[in-house]
């Protein structure tokens, strides 16, 4: 799937796409009787949020895309270290999985590195749901969904793009490009933020989003 997407060739079938996951959100909103919502997502979640806004604009009060990209592979510009860490295969045992999580520090916020917290989060993730094939399916969904260039250029919803200046997995350029494509988008670049949202930055991120959504 990845090779076909990068070469812009016909794609083999995939279990689901970003559109399917965006449709899941619509289903949840219907169940909750919500006609509109502020749609926020980070990383792959930002891609799903973009697709939601594109395909369901009347249900979108605003779009908040965090450390994400517009479906243009050339904007990702991952460092070799970050990509190596992302593609590394974790051990299947709990202890090995937890220690392996430290490799992801390659693309996380260096200033706020916290190995103990990384281990605790990995332990929680393993205990909640260790399902490696899910990661493969998620990657397939991303690449199978293609470019959103023209669709984002035609988007007419209030949009906030947030991106870390130190992100080495999805480059700051990807955030800048996303904001450039969407008419009227607001771009906020965050100092010392990698491809994660460490606790010391929570206040700044929440305040930024709150100020934006309260105006909409």
Model-derived segments and spans:
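Conserved alpha/beta-hydrolase catalytic His-Asp/Glu region
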Residues: 96-137
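Short beta-strand/loop motif that positions the catalytic acidic residue
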Residues: 155, 161-163
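Conserved acidic catalytic loop of the alpha/beta-hydrolase fold
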Residues: 19-37
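Flexible "cap/lid" loop of the alpha/beta hydrolase fold
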Residues: 63-92
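Conserved hydrolase catalytic core segment
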Residues: 35-74
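Catalytic active-site module of serine/aspartate enzymes centered on a nucleophile-bearing elbow/loop
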Residues: 185-216
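Acidic catalytic loop of the alpha/beta-hydrolase fold
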Residues: 166-170
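Active-site nucleophile elbow and catalytic-triad environment of alpha/beta-hydrolase enzymes
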Residues: 135-151
């Amino acid at each position: 799937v990845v090779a076909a997407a990068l070469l812009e060739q016909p794609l083999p079938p995939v279990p689901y796409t970003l559109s399917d996951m965006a449709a899941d959100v619509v289903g949840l909103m219907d169940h909750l009787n919500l006609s509109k919502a502020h749609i926020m997502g980070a990383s792959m979640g930002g891609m799903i949020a973009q697709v939601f806004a594109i395909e369901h604009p009347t249900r979108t009060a605003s779009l908040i895309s965090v450390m994400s990209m517009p479906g243009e592979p050339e904007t990702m510009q991952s460092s070799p270290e970050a990509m190596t860490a992302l593609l590394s295969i974790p051990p299947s045992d709990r202890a090995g999985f937890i220690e392996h999580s430290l490799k992801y520090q390659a693309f996380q916020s260096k200033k706020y590195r916290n190995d103990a917290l990384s281990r605790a989060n990995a332990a929680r993730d393993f205990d909640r749901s260790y399902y490696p094939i899910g990661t493969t399916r998620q990657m397939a969904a991303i690449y199978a969904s293609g470019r959103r260039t023209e669709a984002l250029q035609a988007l007419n919803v209030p949009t906030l793009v947030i991106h870390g200046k130190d992100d080495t997995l999805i480059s700051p350029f990807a955030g800048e490009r996303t904001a450039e494509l969407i008419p009227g988008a607001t771009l906020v670049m965050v100092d010392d933020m990698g491809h994660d949202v460490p606790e010391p930055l929570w206040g700044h991120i929440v305040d930024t989003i709150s100020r934006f959504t309260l105006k909409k």
